[in-house]
Amino acid sequence: MSSSQEPSTATHPVRRFKDAGYVEVASTLAELRQRIDALDTRIVGLLAERAACVRDATRFKRDAFQVAAPARQAEVFEKVRALAAHHEDDFPGLPDVVEATYRTLVAGFIAGEDRLFQQTEPIEWPCPSCPRP
């Protein structure tokens, strides 16, 4: 049976997992949504920190190919899939969700880094105040 109503956030669960080992995270949907909102706040903060690192990495790139860094992208996607696989018992298919999320995330960061790259200029050598590459 399908419902066209959003679930009540104050009531108790209306379904249970068949897995006897399942451990609930909260007793109401409202509590779960509060936890999710808090996690979203932390995630956005971490994304902002990642963005600062991506911006700084722009200084080390010579051209658009290096900005895109396809080998690094493949490395990141493989790494996050492996990390997510450790948690797949909690959420089946998590590696697929994480990889899809990271593919979107990385595409957005590369687009931003490409725009930032256009705002840089090559360092002329010798530069007395600059360390050698």
Model-derived features: where do they sit?
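Domain-level signature for soluble enzymes in the chorismate/prephenate branch of the shikimate pathway
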Residues: 2-133
